[in-house]
Amino acid sequence: MPKPPKQNTPLAFRELLEVMPDVQAWMKDREGSYLWVNTAFLMNYGLTRLSQVVGKADRDLSPAHLAAHFEAGDQAVLSGRPVNHRLELVGRYDHSAHWCRTTKLPARDERGTMVGTVGFTRRLTAAEVGQMAEIPLGAVIATMIRRLGGKVTSGELARAAGTSVRGLERAFDRDYCLSPRQYLRRLRMQTACQQLVSTRSTLAQVADRCGFADQSHFNRDFKRMTGMTPRAYRLKFVG
């Protein structure tokens, strides 16, 4: 029977992945159970400890249709077809999502036997999203990302899409099951979560950069969406 990979990846490699807040990384065994994930992965699923993931599979963490998609990718890798730089929409625990590039490769033991899979997915920047014709409403999402800290009107977003405000509403509902405003609010919250953990910015600075009216609005909205205050969230992941 093949010897499984060590649960802990090399320290330097793990440290590198921990300082890349826009990259989720993981290692799984041949059955699809997680052996290791980085902090960005935990944050994406609203978790705080590695022990909450180790031994679990995608079906334990994601809706059935997403889990089936992830598992199909793993099986492709195990069958000798690595996933390289694939464009996909990656969901979060709050039912929002962002566009990413995903790579999955085989994991091998010291004898070269395939014992599982490793992978990472990187969140795309505004420039990347805006340049990809295959991303639905990419120009609008890129505008949202660039204008995250300021005000952006429905008319401006509609012009970026080359349609009317009503047409934009219908397009977002069709492609993302959200209104443009709902998508923008969740995008702001995702970015705030990332900045709370990956930067030393004050709560007021994070609130300003992510487009919240002031820190009190930030605190209220953040607690409503995550169940905790921004300060508690930072302590949860950073300590």
Positions of PLM-derived features:
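Basic/polar phosphate-binding segments, predominantly the helix-turn-helix DNA-binding elements
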Residues: 155-184, 209-229
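PAS-family sensory/regulatory domains
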Residues: 52-65
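Terminal helix-turn-helix DNA-binding modules in bacterial transcription factors
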Residues: 175-213, 236-239
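Sensory coupling linkers of modular signal transduction proteins
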Residues: 106-139
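Conserved hydrophobic beta-strand signature of PAS-family and PAS-like sensory domains
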Residues: 25, 33-35
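Basic, amphipathic alpha-helical hairpins
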Residues: 140-153, 172, 193-202, 222, ...
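Terminal output helix/cap of sensory domains in signal transduction proteins
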Residues: 12-13, 62-91
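N-terminal capping loop/helix in small sensory signaling domains highlighted by a polar->aromatic N-x2-3-F motif
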Residues: 37-41
